[in-house]
Amino acid sequence: MSRIVLALIRFYQLAISPWLPPRCRYQPTCSQYAIEAVQKHGALKGGWLALRRIGRCHPWGSSGYDPVP
């Protein structure tokens, strides 16, 4: 399951993200964070961490360095 999730994220990074303006407020970017979270914690917990991170990434939220726990 992790391989499928990672493949979907990498597809986004290679095929969709280059067409969008940069807008992530964090380092690493949300998609890179998602890859690291899935690799470290597996598809379910890593996916949940990635969704929470994406939910925090908005113009009125905080910014800065936010590593995978």
Swiss-Prot record:
InterPro entries: Membr_insert_effic_factor_YidD. It comes from the Bacteria. It holds the Pfam family YidD. It is a peripheral membrane protein. It is found in: Cell inner membrane. GO terms for cellular component: plasma membrane. Keywords: Cell inner membrane, Cell membrane, Membrane. HAMAP family: UPF0161_YidD. Belongs to the UPF0161 family. NCBIfam families: membrane protein insertion efficiency factor YidD (TIGR00278). Could be involved in insertion of integral membrane proteins into the membrane. This is Putative membrane protein insertion efficiency factor. It comes from Laribacter hongkongensis (strain HLHK9).
